[in-house]
Each structure stands twice: as C-alpha cells, then as structure tokens.
C-alpha cells in the first residue's frame, strides 16, 4: 500500500491517478475527507500535518509514503521535523519526499530541514528536488492578456519549469521501484525559460 500525502494537490492528484491506473493500492491522505475528490476505488484517510497523531495513523501499515510538506519557514519545520522523521521512520515505509531544488543551496530552508529529518530517521528514502511548477505561471495569464509585461524580481533568471504530472510520474517510479532508494533527483522541465 502506498500513502500519498497532499493527495488532492497539484502533484498529489496526478500521483493518486497514476498509481491507481497501475492497479497499485493507494491511500489518499487528505485534510478533509468530506471535501476530497479521489478516484473510485481509492480509500482516503484524514491527515493534518499539525496533528502528529493523524500523521502516525495515516502512514501506519504503508509500504511506501509520498511525503509532501507545506512551505513553512525553516524555524517552523525545525520544530516538528524531527517528530515527522521519527513517525515516518517508525512506520517502516519507504519515503519519497517532494522537496525543492533550493534545498541544496539553502540549508536552513524548510525543504533542507525536512530532507535531513527524513534521511536521519527513515531507512529507505528518495528525495525529489523540483524546480518551479509549470502551473504557477498561469497566474501571469491575465496580466499578459491585458497587454502588460510580466515583471520578475530577477530579470535575467532562467527557470526550467516542470509540469506537475511529470513530477507525479517520477514519484510513482520511486515509490514502486526500490532501485531509487537513497537517491536525490533534481527534476526540471524540458526547456529553460527566460
């Protein structure tokens, strides 16, 4: 059984569908089961990262867990990161953590802190460090359609955005195939945008 946290989010919904279509037993961990829309045949479980007992219950009995951590500050993550790591480690599940490319350069970021907590406590882990999500550029559509210029704080920055379904495909592979244990992968899109 594979537990997908953030199962109704940008990546999670694609991952649940991907695993379900491969006839993998998948459990969707969601904050509010009454509002969650999951494919027929997929079980959901209530989980809120602010309630450690719910996290422990959600991952109990899992063979693998896709772990998604909200973008909190590094200090907020540091407060509970060790507890989360211990819960995931005690479950005995393989863990794939969706991190960010920035974790490598920012050791005090929430991503780096959570990576460290998982690596310290979980026997079998994989880290996916993503660049920007492609869907985030949709916020520019109204601005562009109105004839305006999109302004970016770093005018010469080049980004390689990745579609959320592609992240889900990579996550599914790491959750199913044990050859990815102990690996860190940086996931990027097919081309760089300036």
Regions found by a protein language model. Give the residues of each.
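Oxidoreductase cofactor-interface core, primarily capturing Rossmann-like NAD(P)-dependent enzymes
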Residues: 2-39, 50-53, 60-62, 71-78, ...
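Cofactor-binding loops of NAD(P)H-dependent oxidoreductases
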Residues: 45-47
């Amino acid at each position: 059984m594979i537990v997908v946290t953030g199962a109704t989010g940008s990546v999670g919904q694609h991952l649940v569908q991907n695993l379900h279509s491969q006839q993998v037993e998948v459990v969707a961990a969601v904050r509010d089961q009454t509002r969650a829309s999951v494919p027929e045949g997929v079980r959901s479980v209530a989980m809120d990262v602010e309630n450690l007992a719910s996290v422990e219950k959600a991952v109990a009995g899992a063979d693998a867990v896709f772990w998604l951590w909200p973008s909190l500050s590094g200090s907020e993550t540091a407060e509970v990161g060790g507890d989360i790591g211990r819960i995931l480690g005690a479950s005995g599940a393989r863990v794939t953590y969706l991190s960010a490319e920035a974790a490598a350069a920012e050791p005090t970021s929430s991503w780096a802190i959570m990576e460290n907590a998982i690596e310290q406590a979980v026997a079998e882990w994989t880290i996916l460090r993503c660049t920007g999500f492609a869907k985030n550029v949709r916020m520019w559509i109204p601005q562009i359609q109105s004839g305006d210029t999109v302004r970016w704080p770093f005018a010469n920055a080049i980004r390689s955005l990745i579609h959320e379904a592609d992240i889900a495909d990579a996550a599914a592979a790491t959750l199913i195939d044990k050859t990815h244990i102990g690996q860190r992968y940086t996931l990027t899109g097919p081309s760089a945008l300036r």
